[in-house]
């Protein structure tokens, strides 16, 4: 069983600057909503003028830190409201389909943020208050981000698979193109709704062409991204950072390949809408690759009509107690594991980054050698995981297939994610009201 073939997706690393900028999710919602301040209705919830104003102030602070010229207030507010609507629709989808944010994970995230910034919780609270925020507001932000991240893992990332035939095709294409290139570029997206009418497509194309004309006249790319782009990275100036060509859509690669740093692409059309790219820099990839490999073993209990989630978890808790009391892990794996590795005492051999499903890899990476995890849920059931050892390995010989698998997975996951967001947004009942 290839329970350890994972899509390329991780929860974002928490950082104080990111959360203070509120670049991901909505701030805490008030219990009492003044009706005359409603600026949007999303299904059975509302967004208020006060929430929009708070989000605006946070984003302005963030753009100012980045030295990004500010768009006109009315333009940025409209952009932010659209983003808040989409985020709320995603949160609702997650909650309505059974996703929950574990309070323990929320508190751990807060503690990590404080530790990363060399603060205790009181210091973190003081830092937030200087930015006009609260600890409870940050908790809500983290909770909402966890909801969306878990829903994405379940609905998108864990359903991505990469076949050997796809890897072979990728490597053949790379061989024909020569050495792979990395691109540092920025991006503006004018999205087109699914099943858009010809009139909607013409309107979106006109918007994109107007942006392109402004760029040709010398307008600031980051400012136009913040005010007009529908992409998730719009409020960061649209910058993608460094991406290997194999992890990008072919449409982008073909546009970027002949460009020189500082140049802007013509209008590009994809299933998601109209794209404009600006090349910041490009470079060849390093020919060598060293990765941290993990030697691990596990015990898997599958769930079915007879074995419930709770039953599987409780069985593993009992097995972990026996391991903690001195019973050998491999003996229990041979007796109880329902994975093909049971005959080998649950031994999975050496695992590379990107080999396992997100839930499994995240839990495995948190363990020290010799440590046994608490029960971990994955799409395949419930696991106990033990890390035996780790090593840094020069995998130059394996590099091509490893990079190919990760590149294909990341590209497919990103495309599927954009489709997923668009479908949820289009399916939501949305009523936009005047902001002022």
Curated annotation (Swiss-Prot):
Enzyme Commission identifier(s): 5.2.1.8
Compartments where located: Periplasm
Domain PpiC: 180-281, 291-389
Signal peptide: 1-30
A biological-process GO annotation: protein folding
UniProt feature coiled coil, ranges: none
Major localization listed first in the record, in broad terms: periplasm
InterPro entries named in the record: OMP_Chaperone_SurA, PPIase_dom_sf, PPIase_PpiC, PPIase_PpiC_CS, PPIase_SurA, SurA_N, Trigger_fact/SurA_dom_sf
Highest taxon listed in the record's lineage: Bacteria
Pfam family, one: SurA_N
Molecular functions per Gene Ontology: peptide binding; peptidyl-prolyl cis-trans isomerase activity; unfolded protein binding
Entry GO terms, CC: outer membrane-bounded periplasmic space
Keywords: Chaperone, Isomerase, Periplasm, Repeat, Rotamase, Signal
Reaction catalysed by this enzyme: [protein]-peptidylproline (omega=180) = [protein]-peptidylproline (omega=0)
Domain notes: The PPIase activity resides only in the second parvulin domain. The N-terminal region and the C-terminal tail are necessary and sufficient for the chaperone activity of SurA. The PPIase activity is dispensable for SurA to function as a chaperone. The N-terminal region and the C-terminal tail are also required for porin recognition.
Function text: Chaperone involved in the correct folding and assembly of outer membrane proteins. Recognizes specific patterns of aromatic residues and the orientation of their side chains, which are found more frequently in integral outer membrane proteins. May act in both early periplasmic and late outer membrane-associated steps of protein maturation.
Protein name per the record: Chaperone SurA
Gene that this polypeptide is encoded by: surA
């Amino acid at each position: 069983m290839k329970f350890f073939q994972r899509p390329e997706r991780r929860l974002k690393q928490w950082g104080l600057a990111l959360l203070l900028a509120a670049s991901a999710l909505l701030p805490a919602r008030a219990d009492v909503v003044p009706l005359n301040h409603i600026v949007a209705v999303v299904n059975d919830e509302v967004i208020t003028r006060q929430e929009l104003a708070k989000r605006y102030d946070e984003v302005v602070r963030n753009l100012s830190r980045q030295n990004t010229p500010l768009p006109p207030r009315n333009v940025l507010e409209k952009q932010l409201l659209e983003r808040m609507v989409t985020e709320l629709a995603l949160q609702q989808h997650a909650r309505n389909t059974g996703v929950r944010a574990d309070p323990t994970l929320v508190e751990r995230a807060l503690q990590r943020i404080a530790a990363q910034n060399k603060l205790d919780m009181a210091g973190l609270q003081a830092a937030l208050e200087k930015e006009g925020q609260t600890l409870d507001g940050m908790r809500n932000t983290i909770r909402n981000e966890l909801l969306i991240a878990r829903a994405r893992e379940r609905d998108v990332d864990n359903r991505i698979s990469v076949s050997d035939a796809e890897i072979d095709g990728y490597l053949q294409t790379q061989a024909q193109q020569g050495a792979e290139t990395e691109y540092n570029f920025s991006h503006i997206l004018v999205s087109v709704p699914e099943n858009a009418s010809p009139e909607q497509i013409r309107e979106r194309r006109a918007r994109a062409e107007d942006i392109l004309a402004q760029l040709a006249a010398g307008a600031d790319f980051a400012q136009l991204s913040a005010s007009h782009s529908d992409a998730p990275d719009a409020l960061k100036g649209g910058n993608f950072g460094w991406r290997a060509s194999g992890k990008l859509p072919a449409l982008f690669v073909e546009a970027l390949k002949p460009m020189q740093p500082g140049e802007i692409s013509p209008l590009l059309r994809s299933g998601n809408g109209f794209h404009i790219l600006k090349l910041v820099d490009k470079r060849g990839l390093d020919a060598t690759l060293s990765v941290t490999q993990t030697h691990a073993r596990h015990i898997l209990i599958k769930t079915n009509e007879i074995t419930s989630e709770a039953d599987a978890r409780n069985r593993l808790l009992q097995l972990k107690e026996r391991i903690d009391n001195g019973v050998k892990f491999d003996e229990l794996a041979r007796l109880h594991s329902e994975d093909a590795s049971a005959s080998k005492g649950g031994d999975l051999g050496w695992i590379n980054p990107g080999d396992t499903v997100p839930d499994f890899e995240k839990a495995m990476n948190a363990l020290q050698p010799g440590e046994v995890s608490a029960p971990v849920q994955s799409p395949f059931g419930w696991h106990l995981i033990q890390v035996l050892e780790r090593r840094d390995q020069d995998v130059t010989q394996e590099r091509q297939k490893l990079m190919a698998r990760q590149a294909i997975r990341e590209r497919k996951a990103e495309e599927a994610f954009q489709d997923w967001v668009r479908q949820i947004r289009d399916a939501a009942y949305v009523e936009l009201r005047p902001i002022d």
